[in-house]
């Protein structure tokens, strides 16, 4: 199913996912440090990065950006986001099982998207 998605549509899917992710970091994780064990400013920073990444996707069409460059940029940014989240998991001693589950789920979803974006990028590159 995901192979048939055009690069432009994949960029919009990424933008939507990054927006949802950012809002979850801000509104769910950031406001419930006792439940997730992730204290400020970490949720605000990760949420802000996700929202910033989403702008690239939302403005992709407005700015008439190259799909190849946008996909490559999103691949790099999404991978960096996952590395940051993984570092949080490895270094935060106060993180709860709910925080671990949310962060691990975030990494799985985003890295799956990175793999799909990489395949789309390679198909444009050839």
Language model segments and positions:
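Short, Lys/Arg-rich, polar N-terminal cytosolic tail immediately upstream
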Residues: 1-5
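Membrane-helix boundary elements
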Residues: 7-42
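Non-cytosolic membrane-interface motifs at loop->transmembrane helix junctions
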Residues: 36-43, 69-73, 96-106
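Small-residue-rich transmembrane alpha-helices that serve as helix-helix interface/gating elements
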Residues: 48, 99-116
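Canonical alpha-helical transmembrane segments
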Residues: 51-64
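Membrane-helix boundary connector in multi-pass membrane proteins
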Residues: 62-65, 83-103, 120-122
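Hydrophobic alpha-helical membrane segments
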Residues: 72-88, 109
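Membrane-water interface at the C-terminal end of transmembrane alpha helices
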Residues: 88, 108-126
